[in-house]
């Protein structure tokens, strides 16, 4: 049976690989950040239970990283529609690089948030003045994932520009 696909037959593989990479790596970063900072919150809560709700900020910030990967994965997967238009290797590579940019940025941000969150909430239990400093460092770590999201959106928008229509 002949394929009705117009474009390069292997290109969608790279596009879908980019969508998977965005979601998998971002969720790995979110999981690591949530687990690492959650351990810090749990051990800090034994000493100072009144600070538990204030100390879940790193856990929430780490959880947001998975949403960034989901956004890029949805953008990429909606851009892969071989029946609507041809899909070339340039498009697949653009989507792959988009997914890797967002996913790996989310992974590294999750690692930073987890480490800073763990140490920060434990230190906050000993010295409450450190809370603002911890939040600022967490914001800078979260910005790393935002950079990946922005670059991922820009790279994903490049798909489809390899041909004159």
Swiss-Prot record:
It is found in: Vacuole membrane. Expressed in leaf, root, flower and silique, with lower expression in roots. One of its GO terms (cellular component) is vacuole. Residues 1-12, 77-95, 156-165 are lumenal. Disulfide bonds: none annotated. It is a multi-pass membrane protein. One of its GO terms (molecular function) is proton-transporting ATPase activity, rotational mechanism. SUPFAM superfamilies: F1F0 ATP synthase subunit C (SSF81333). Residues 34-55, 118-129 are cytoplasmic. The chain crosses the membrane at residues 13-33, 56-76, 96-117, 130-155. The keyword Ion transport applies. The record marks 142 as: Essential for proton translocation. Keywords: Hydrogen ion transport, Ion transport, Membrane, Transmembrane, Transmembrane helix, Transport, Vacuole. Its main location: membrane. InterPro entries: ATPase_proteolipid_c-like_dom, ATPase_proteolipid_csu, ATPase_proteolipid_su_C_euk, F/V-ATP_Csub_sf. Proton-conducting pore forming subunit of the membrane integral V0 complex of vacuolar ATPase. V-ATPase is responsible for acidifying a variety of intracellular compartments in eukaryotic cells. V-ATPase is a heteromultimeric enzyme composed of a peripheral catalytic V1 complex (components A to H) attached to an integral membrane V0 proton pore complex (components: a, c, c'', d and e). The proteolipid components c and c'' are present as a hexameric ring that forms the proton-conducting pore. Belongs to the V-ATPase proteolipid subunit family. This is V-type proton ATPase subunit c2.
């Amino acid at each position: 049976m002949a394929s009705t696909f117009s474009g390069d037959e292997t290109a969608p593989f790279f596009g879908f690989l980019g969508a998977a990479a965005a979601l998998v790596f971002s969720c790995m970063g979110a999981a690591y950040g949530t687990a690492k900072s959650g351990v810090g919150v749990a051990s800090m809560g034994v000493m100072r239970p009144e600070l538990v709700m204030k100390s879940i900020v790193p856990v929430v910030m780490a959880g947001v990283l998975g949403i960034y990967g989901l956004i890029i994965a949805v953008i990429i997967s909606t851009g892969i529609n071989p029946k609507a238009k041809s899909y070339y290797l340039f498009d697949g590579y653009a989507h792959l690089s988009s997914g890797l940019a967002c996913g790996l940025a989310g992974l590294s941000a999750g690692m930073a948030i987890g480490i800073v969150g763990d140490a920060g909430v434990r230190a906050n239990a000993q010295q409450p003045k450190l809370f603002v400093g911890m939040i600022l460092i967490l914001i800078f770590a979260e910005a790393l994932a935002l950079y990946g999201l922005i670059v991922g959106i820009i790279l994903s928008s490049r798909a489809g520009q390899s041909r004159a229509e």
